[in-house]
Amino acid sequence: RLYAIIAIAFVVVAIGLVVWNSNIIQRGTTAVTVEGESYSAAEVSYYYHNAYNSIVNSNYVSLYGIDKNTALSQQSLNDTAKMMLGVSEDMTWDAYFRDAAKKSLIQLTMLKKGAAEKGLTFDDDMQKEIDSTLETFSTYAKKAGYSTSAYLKLMYGNNMTMSTFKSILKDTVLASHYQQDYIDSLTYTDEEVETYYNEHKNNFDVADYEYIYFKGTADST
């Protein structure tokens, strides 16, 4: 399938994004606005923590060098982390996760707009997906020794509530269905695929490798 090639173009479009500041933002306050769509601090926090959790739960967390006992705004990506994540500039982990949250919200907004234009609406099958997710989340909360509401705050920040979580899931499920419908609707010839490949070889002709990192000193001579 051509999923890797057909990256949804509108994910990276230039759109009006009002970034939240670093002060404490109350739960109902608009933290980010994307194309006229307002997102609360809790919604921003969800995508921030999603990005954070994906890093700290990855197999390469030891290479990223995140210190969980130090504020993310006080520690920067090391050279290995920048190389692995494709980051070219120096930045703190807090800035990296904020940027990841912004990109997720941009993508979500554009997919929601696409769904609305197509007339795709939330249906019973989508609700079943959400119900399954909520059931799984509740199971993990119990295994960890938390109530569902406490586990939500642990995973996604103190502003997160069950109603906000359900709203986020509804948006993401609808966006996901539209994205898949869009991909499935695309048609292309072998010649078009070949042309695209030839124009973007550097994106596909890459080596697969693993990192082995260790510290040591040279043998004395």
Which residues are covered by each model-predicted region?
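Short extracytoplasmic
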Residues: V34-L63
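Peptidyl-prolyl cis-trans isomerase
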Residues: R1-T29, G36, A71, Q75, ...
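Alpha-helical membrane-embedding segments
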Residues: S62-A71
